[in-house]
Amino acid sequence: MQKSRLFIIPVLLGLMCQPGLVFAKSNPPQLIENQVVEAACGECQFHLKGKGCNLAVRINGKAYFVDGTGIDEHGDAHASDGFCTTIRKARVSGQIVNGRFQASSFELLPFSGASY
C-alpha cells in the first residue's frame, strides 16, 4: 500500500504540471457595444434548440439566446412583424457569456417590411 502511494503521488503531480492537460480554460466574455444585429425567435427563425419561443440575436453569423430582455417585451412574437415570423434588426450592448448574450441594452429598430 505504501509503495503504491509513493508511485501515484509523483504521477499526479506530473499531470497537474502539464499546461492545458488537466484544466480547461474558459473564454473571456466578448463585449458588444452599440452594435446593430439580427434579432428573432431563436427556435422559429435561427433554429436553435430550446423549448417554446425565446428571443435570440445573431452576431457575426452566430446565434445566441438573450438574457436581460424577453421575446414578449417587444410586441406580439406571432404578429406579421413579430420575432417568430420575421428576423428584425436591433441595436444592442452587452456581452457573450457561456454561449448566451447578456443584454445590458436592447433597442428594436423600426420594421422595414422585409425579413433580413
How does the language model describe each region?
Residues 22-26:
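Boundary at the C-terminal end of the N-terminal hydrophobic targeting segment
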